[in-house]
Structures are given as C-alpha cells and as structure tokens.
Design a protein with these regions (language model features):
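Repeated scaffold domains used in trafficking and secretory/extracellular systems
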Residues: 30-40, 75-91, 127-138, 177-192, ...
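Residue position within the beta-strands of beta-propeller blades
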Residues: 47, 100-101, 144-145, 201, ...
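Short coil/turn segments that connect the beta-strands within blades of beta-propeller domains
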Residues: 42-44, 94-96, 138-140, 195-197, ...
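Short glycine/acidic-enriched loop and turn motifs that connect beta-strands
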Residues: 50-54, 103-107, 147-153, 204-209, ...
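Solenoidal tandem-repeat scaffolds enriched in leucines and small polar residues
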Residues: 133-225
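A short beta-strand motif characteristic of beta-propeller blades
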Residues: 23-29, 66-81, 119-125, 167-182, ...
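Short loop/turn segments that connect beta-strands within beta-propeller blades
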Residues: 62-65, 115-119, 162-166, 216-220, ...
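Bacterial N-terminal signal peptides
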Residues: 5-15
Length: 271
C-alpha cells in the first residue's frame, strides 16, 4: 500500500501531460486523471494516472469513490478520448476489457488491454499514428483510427484488430457505398448504445456539412450519414448527440433538435 501511495503522488504531479502532448499537431487521444471512464454497468470508474515511466489504473467503486483495486503497468498510458467534447471510452460492453493508449504522434502507438476480472495485461503495438475508436461488446475486436495526415487536413481510416488472432485486418472498415476513400473531419461527440454494439460519432468538416459515422462493432460495418445542416465548422463543433428510447439519434444545437437519424433505416429527418 505504501508503494501505491508513493506512485499515486508522483502520478498526480504528472497528470495532464498526456493531453498536452497529444495536442501537438494531432488529435487529443488520451486522458490521465480527470473523470476517467465508467464501466457500462455504472459500478466502476477507471482512472489512469502516470508518472511518465509507469501508469497506475485505479478501479474506483461507484457510488462511494473507494479505490478497491489497482493495476500498475510500465509506460505512459491514458484513457482514450474519442471526441473533442472530452468523451472518453475504452470499456467493452460486457465490462471485461479496459483499453488504454499511449498518446498519438510517436513512431509507434501502443495499446494496453486489461482484463477487469483477472487483471491480465495484453499489449498491441503498431507503427505510425493511431488512436482508439471502439471495441466490440465481447472485447474480441479492437477498432482503431489510422491517421494518414495530421493538421488542418486531417485524414484517416478505421481499422479492425482481431485480438484473438493478434493481427490487424487488411481491409479498412468503410461504408460500402462510399468505398475505401480516406475519411476527413474532426470527431466532435459520440453516443454508444447501452450494449456497446453501435458507436455513433458526429464529425465536423471545414467546407462540407457534418456527418455521423455509425459503426457496428459486431458486424464490422460502418455507415457515413451526411446531415443536411448548413453550418460553418465552429457551429458544427457545438453539436451534440442524444439517443432516444425509440432508437432515434437526435442532433442537438443547444436545447434545439436540428436533425434526427432513424438508426434502423439511417434516414435523416431535418427539424
């Protein structure tokens, strides 16, 4: 316990560095400290603290806030940040797998996967700039964003990594109607279904309308849904998503609903 306290003090002193490093020409991809990420059942919050050389992942009970377990791992890792509004992710729908990532921008990108029951640790290392996107409900497939160009002309592909076979699947995850073109835009906000199967991400673009990227993490399929909204990019950045019980995905600007997507048919209704 004494060792844990010493490491926590050192990690708290370094908190925030990962987010700062991730902003150097690329997307914000990890969070250390802060709110961490909550398990799908709402009973545990996972918070990563790093000294730079080591990372401590605290398992915090909810409600109450007591640290009841922790996992130490070598290296600099954080909870994945998947959108500019600060949305975090990284827990599979069944709650068994927690994903952490190194900041993007290095020669390689590493991902650490912790089994939340056995505490077993696995690592995935890929050359180039990558970030976490999603994980299948059973924790068998990791979805990653492979960046081709950073900066104002940010471009990327979504790729799938089979964790059982420990290999990156050759074909990108794309909308079949669009083909294997590079995606462009900035992820603004995300909503995920309660079972962890569908991840809906709203992207802003500089000279085009915003769009929703709908990722089916079970069938390894994606759909790009253009939103008929005449908004400049700063206004697109203020949009938020809300999932209704009737499976409608609302696009909101402040308190107003400006569009809605029927997630069963992918038809967009402008308000």
């Amino acid at each position: 316990m004494k060792k844990l306290v010493v490491l926590l003090v050192a990690a708290l002193a370094a908190t925030g560095a990962a987010s700062a490093d991730a902003q150097k020409g690329g997307p914000v991809t990890v969070l250390t400290g802060g709110q961490g990420v909550v398990a799908p059942d709402g009973r545990v919050r996972y918070i990563a603290l790093t000294t730079g050389r080591e990372t401590i992942v605290s398992f915090v009970q909810l409600p109450g806030g007591q640290v009841h377990r922790w996992r130490q791992l070598p290296g600099y890792f954080g909870i994945p940040v998947i959108a500019l509004d600060g949305t975090t992710d990284g827990v599979s729908g069944d709650g068994r797998t927690l994903v952490l990532s190194t900041p993007s921008g290095g020669v390689t990108t590493q991902f650490a996967l912790i089994d939340t029951k056995t505490m077993r640790l696995r690592r995935v290392t890929l050359r180039g700039t990558w970030s976490y996107d999603a994980i299948s409900p059973d924790g068998s497939v990791l979805y990653l964003i492979q960046y081709k160009e950073l900066g104002p002309s940010l471009s990327y592909r979504v790729r799938a990594y089979d964790l059982a076979e420990r290999r990156l699947l050759a074909r990108p995850i794309v909308d079949a109607e669009i083909g294997e073109r590079l995606m462009r835009g900035w992820s603004v906000t995300r909503k995920t279904t309660s079972d962890g199967r569908w991840a809906y991400t709203l992207y802003a673009r500089a000279k085009k309308e915003p769009f929703v990227h709908a990722l089916d993490t079970v069938r390894r399929q994606a759909y790009c849904i253009d939103l008929p909204l005449d908004l400049e990019r700063p206004d697109q950045m203020s949009l938020r998503l809300a999932l209704r019980a009737d499976r409608m995905l609302e696009v909101r600007k402040g308190r107003d609903t400006v569009a809605a997507v029927d997630t069963r048919t992918l038809v967009v209704h402008k308000h």
